[in-house]
Curated annotation (Swiss-Prot):
Its cofactor is Mn(2+). It catalyses: L-fucose = L-fuculose. PANTHER family: L-FUCOSE ISOMERASE. CDD domains: L-fucose_isomerase (cd03556). NCBIfam families: fucI, PRK10991.1. It comes from Escherichia coli (strain 55989 / EAEC). This is L-fucose isomerase. Mn(2+) binds at residues 337, 361, 528.
Amino acid sequence: MKKISLPKIGIRPVIDGRRMGVRESLEEQTMNMAKATAALLTEKLRHACGAAVECVISDTCIAGMAEAAACEEKFSSQNVGLTITVTPCWCYGSETIDMDPTRPKAIWGFNGTERPGAVYLAAALAAHSQKGIPAFSIYGHDVQDADDTSIPADVEEKLLRFARAGLAVASMKGKSYLSLGGVSMGIAGSIVDHNFFESWLGMKVQAVDMTELRRRIDQKIYDEAELEMALTWADKNFRYGEDENNKQYQRNAEQSRAVLRESLLMAMCIRDMMQGNSKLADIGRVEESLGYNAIAAGFQGQRHWTDQYPNGDTAEAILNSSFDWNGVREPFVVATENDSLNGVAMLMGHQLTGTAQVFADVRTYWSPEAIERVTGHKLDGLAEHGIIHLINSGSAALDGSCKQRDSEGNPTMKPHWEISQQEADACLAATEWCPAIHEYFRGGGYSSRFLTEGGVPFTMTRVNIIKGLGPVLQIAEGWSVELPKDVHDILNKRTNSTWPTTWFAPRLTGKGPFTDVYSVMANWGANHGVLTIGHVGADFITLASMLRIPVCMHNVEETKVYRPSAWAAHGMDIEGQDYRACQNYGPLYKR
């Protein structure tokens, strides 16, 4: 099939239409603003897949209805998914604005004294508010000279934040969530809500029974040569941890090999179901070769699959990572236990950063007193107020070991286009594969085990659905924490020492859900969460406002909160504004 084109950013230079001197004097300055904006975005941003971001600039400056319509025709033909309107001067507000109701939009009004760019910005935003089409305001803090073509740092920050979030919105639209299986062990996030995906994200849900995965494996609907390559890769790179099962449940070498083979096959087949694979057409499986156009997926696993077949831990861990037997590549988004709401948080994080996402149980709050009682160790540094144990049976991306390095040599998780093969190998070397515990997984499997390096900034997120309200987003910025090995071992063995662990310390504010670490744990809305590298909560907030998903919990500095200008008309408290505005406007793709 022809690859679906990536969304582009549309740049709309608007201008005062009065001829005989006014428009003529502004043409060059206005178009240069558009070109400078496009240059910034193409230099600083990439799509989550790693491709360069493209900007489309209107053929002419826009002074009124006719030129606005011509611009819209061009944008419609080039898959423009978000727009930025720029101007240094007064223009005719409602005559020049972008009226597309679902396309994210921002307006940059140049802060200068010669021409009233700020006046147009205010007039245009008033029109957006009155018409119920919210837009983001960009206005520099300091006055610039008319001939100053630079983009101030505060303007650049807003342009980039808007564009990152807008590209995420546009990239999700029209894609699907592959629900492989049904409800896992009564977990509410795996009660997949089609209306949520359709109305808030512009996505479809493809529901497929797990027997389809069984069929593909049993009928060899996969690339057999690739399977051999995957097995060779695993033989070279997998280190195996101890088998903690009772003797009667331990598998011999032949049985273990069969479990590994099926685990790798599951990864291949889930990937093929998500994105398709032309190799399947070569073996006469044309229908299966197309895939389901899935930008994210979830696998139920427990218990209807895992009671008799290998669990999804190996497949999910490999798919969620930025590398496999084919080398470094874009990570997939696959939610364990088909927790679609955690899958959406993973999808948001990946679209905003291009990085792999760490899926985890929000398992245990350890107070400083409890840790000292159990281990004799007194917490200090980032961990002094207590920590949260983030751990799951193995679906976390191996990037979460943080064996990659930033430009200053610090541990991190990088966008896949920056990861070297050596860094991928280091993540693999830091991971052990432990036989699944029989009591949980009767069909066997392998769980990845690694320990996240400490001192790494992370943002933990989660989407929940509240009856009568709709979706809400939770955000907690913080850091991974490194404990002394003996302390980690004692605490880890109290849970499950064969699973990957991140010790997480959220940043506290002393208020509300961030009064203390216990309050963060107590206010978390579900049993799962996602770790995204960096303190990127502000980007999540902007993205959520575009989708009309209110944020019910965050610890982002107020100065970094960036939402459409119309939110300010919904009260004086910015979080109350968010709830009222999201309720007022309703989901982005209203149904």
